A protein has these predicted regions:
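Histidine/cysteine-enriched polar flanking segments
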Residues: 1-334
């Protein structure tokens, strides 16, 4: 039985968010199916999610949450070792709408259940409604029997934060200060919420992300802690690249920053794609009221930085770009 914890915060109770490079018990995923978001009836997306789940499974357990309509399809396609759980959601981004797990020094595990509003709510969110996504974190906590803290009304997605596990949070002003998140709170108040609910002491604010239109600039496309005192950061020397200015600014900021322990950060460069990735097949995506329409030629946010660290490996995205191999080699050297 999982309970809601009220009248306290994770920091007061001795809990912190662990870094992504710390040991993991498993990975949770959501299964894509929205015809108004994914092309070709979500079949290419399902194949990609299947490949990701299969790759992760080599290193740790995987649970995939699936709607009732897709349960049989997902169960038959996913490896038998993958746990498939029937769960309703509005889309497939559990990193953003799922729980932020916490640990303490005695092996205890808890979680934060942030309020989720589809990356901007009625201001600039990607779809409406989002109520099922906002229930995902609590459902996962119930299944895992993990007690949780609910930040009712305080909006945050998992992809908007990275931590080093030693007191430092990494985020962007573009996202957390956006009008569609927490417009009633100042930067200082948001920073205090991050420290209280992630068990941290210092927040590093990169100014801009590379995705202003969909996630409002999530940090997981820009930079990530890979070890205590070390971060990876997107990089390009191509002044014509659409993300050149953001990459240069982020690298400069991190190169001059120190973490919560006072260490000057060691910054590793991770290349961007050689060419921008452009959306194709928009005519196979359904147009539905309440959802932002897709158009051919839109710049897709293709960032090698949006990798996943698992136990003993890194699952790094590939885009059919000539820099795919470069990114793999750079990742291996980190």
């Amino acid at each position: 039985m999982a309970k809601r914890i009220t009248g306290s915060t994770p920091k007061l109770d001795g809990y912190r968010m662990p870094a992504e490079f710390e040991p993991q018990a498993g990975v949770w995923m959501l299964w894509p199916e929205r015809n108004d978001n994914w092309r070709d009836g979500a079949k290419p997306a399902q194949k990609a999610f299947l490949d990701v789940a299969t790759a992760i499974l080599q290193f740790e357990p995987v649970t995939v949450c699936v709607s009732p309509a897709q349960y049989q399809n997902a169960r038959e396609r996913l490896p038998r070792a993958v746990r498939v759980v029937e769960m309703a959601s509005n889309d497939a981004w559990i990193r953003d709408c799922g729980p932020t797990f916490l640990v303490n020094d005695n092996g205890g595990v808890r979680a934060v259940d942030w309020t989720f509003n589809a990356w901007g709510g009625l201001v600039d969110g990607l779809y409406f409604p989002w109520d099922l996504d906002d229930q995902v974190a609590q459902k996962v906590c119930e299944i895992e029997r993990v007690d949780s803290y609910r930040t009712e009304g305080f909006v945050l997605e998992g992809g908007s934060i990275h931590v080093d596990g030693e007191g430092t949070v990494l985020t962007t002003e573009m996202c957390l200060l956006s009008e569609g998140r927490n417009p009633d709170k100042s930067k200082e108040e948001i920073e205090q919420m991050l420290c209280n609910y992630l068990g941290c002491e210092k927040v590093l604010w990169i100014k801009d992300g590379i995705d202003p239109d969909e996630t409002n600039g999530h940090i997981d496309d820009v930079a990530c802690f890979i070890a205590p005192g070390e971060v990876a950061c997107i990089w390009t020397e191509d002044k014509n690249h659409p993300f050149y200015e953001q990459a240069q600014a982020a690298y400069k900021f991190l190169s001059e920053a120190t973490d919560a322990k006072g260490r000057k950060l060691k910054v590793h460069k991770l290349c961007l794609t050689k060419k921008p990735c452009l959306l194709e097949g928009a005519d196979t995506i359904d147009a539905v009221e309440g959802t932002i329409p897709r158009e051919d030629g839109e710049v897709s946010i293709a960032s090698y930085m949006n990798f996943l660290i698992v136990n003993g490996a890194v699952i790094l995205p590939q885009y059919g770009d000539e820099n795919d191999a470069v990114a793999i080699e750079q990742g291996r050297k980190m």
